[in-house]
Structures are given as structure tokens and as C-alpha cells.
Amino acid sequence: MNTRNRVVNSGLGASPASRPTRDPQDPSGRQGELSPVEDQREGLEAAPKGPSRESVVHAGQRRTSAYTLIAPNINRRNEIQRIAEQELANLEKWKEQNRAKPVHLVPRRLGGSQSETEVRQKQQLQLMQSKYKQKLKREESVRIKKEAEEAELQKMKAIQREKSNKLEEKKRLQENLRREAFREHQQYKTAEFLSKLNTESPDRSACQSAVCGPQSSTWKLPILPRDHSWARSWAYRDSLKAEENRKLQKMKDEQHQKSELLELKRQQQEQERAKIHQTEHRRVNNAFLDRLQGKSQPGGLEQSGGCWNMNSGNSWGI
């Protein structure tokens, strides 16, 4: 294999003494210069006379003017060619082994075991039933959608019912706490009033006990004056609470009535839809039976005078 080596410039590597001197009288300036052919001949003649280190290192090289030609390595070239041929042979062998095999199928009759008449009747029956299948499919999807909506509505009702129960429980706890605080406050005020009354009038109480001693052995609390402002405030609070309870009960009743009305309306719609579906189903069945009866009778169409065909077309909604 021929490869190009780096360019060796003979003029740059030569010493100044070895360079040819130019004669000043030579106008062309070519005196002392050799042609490429003469330079090659001199190089070939000088090689056997004085073998240098470069000639020993670059064995098998040949100088051609400013380039050096290297002879190919025969053994390496043969080895590369042998490996390439072996790889090509292996590739062809692999292709031959992995080639797609022919497909052998058992011949059989197309169309199955049914006759053409049976297949056509089956196709006609499927075509006639496809309309009703689509209708049933739509009704089924509507029913599933309504069931999902009803489940969602029941879920929302349960959530609202739970919220109302929690609100009632919270109000009941608040009312119990309020009553407990009021009872404690009342007991505290009563005890304070009694202690103040006992400290301010000990003589009067002793006198009353001495006067009333022989007559009665039990001592009764004096009748306290009623605080009208406190009574009015508590009456106002009780009235507000009663008003709130009445409004809450009214809202519950309205919500219950609305839910009952919605349930009644839904039931009526379901009944109407069932009636319509039943009527349509009966009409279609009658039309289908009429058509079958007309086909079974040999002179059915001629006897009716074409009126049966018109009625059957109207019955099918055409």
C-alpha cells in the first residue's frame, strides 16, 4: 500500500557550503543548479557508496524529487485482505442461515362453514338490530349518568346533614355552658348578698329571731326585690333563641319539602320515560312482525296495494 510521507526539503537541510554558488556573469542564474532528473540520478548513485543512518532507518523508501515513497508491507496487506474476505464470508453465511423461511398454510375454504344465504340473513338481522342496540346503549349511558348524579346528590345531602348535626351539637354545648356559668354566677351573687345582709343588720336579725322564736323554729330568707332589667335581658335572650330555633326548623322543613318534591319529580320522569320506552318498543315489534308477515305471504304486497310498504316505512321512522 502506497502512502505519502512528510515532505523532505533537500534545499533547506543542506549546509551553506554545499549549496551551489551563483555566477554573477550568468544572467539566468541556473549555473550550478541541477535538474530533478539529474538530482535523482545522483541520489541513487550516492546511496551504495556511503550508506548513512537515514538510509538504514528508512529502508524500503525511495526518494522522488521532494517526496519520499514508502513501499507497502505485503504481509500486513495480505492479512487485512484475508480478514476482510473471512468477515464477508461469515456475513453471507449468517444471511443464509437467518433468511426468512417460506410460509406453508393449509388451504381452506373462505367464508367458514356457513352458506352465503345464511351470512346475508345474519348481516341483515344485525343491520336491523343495530339501531335498537345504539338506542339501548344511549339509554344505558343516560341511566349510568343519572345514577352518578343521584349518588353525588345523596353525598352532598349527607354532608349537609352532618354539618347541621354538628351545628346543633355545638349550640347545645354552648347553651349548657351558658346555663352552668349563669348558675355559678347566681350562686355567687346570692352568697354575697346573704353575707352582706348578715353583716349589716345583726341586731335586726337577732331581734326577729327573738320575737319569732317561740312561734316558729325555722328561719326563712327574706324576699329579695326582683331586678326588672335582668329579667328583661334574659327574656330578650330567650326570645332571640326561640326565634333562631324557629327559623332553623323552618329552613329544615323547607329543605325536606324540596327534597321530597325533587324525588317525586324524578319518579314521575322515570315513569314517563318507562312508558315512552315501552310504547316505542311495542310499536317497533309490531312493525317488525308486520314486515315478517308480509314477507311470508306470497301476495301480501300486491293485495295491500303498496299501503303496507308505506305503513312499514312510517313505522320505522323513515
Curated annotation (Swiss-Prot):
Residue runs in coiled coils: 73-188, 240-280
The keyword Coiled coil belongs to this UniProt entry's keyword annotation: yes
InterPro entries: EPSTI1
Expression triggers: Up-regulated in breast carcinomas.
Keyword Repeat: no
Role of this protein: Plays a role in M1 macrophage polarization and is required for the proper regulation of gene expression during M1 versus M2 macrophage differentiation. Might play a role in RELA/p65 and STAT1 phosphorylation and nuclear localization upon activation of macrophages.
Protein name: Epithelial-stromal interaction protein 1
Higher taxonomy: Eukaryota, Metazoa, Chordata, Craniata, Vertebrata
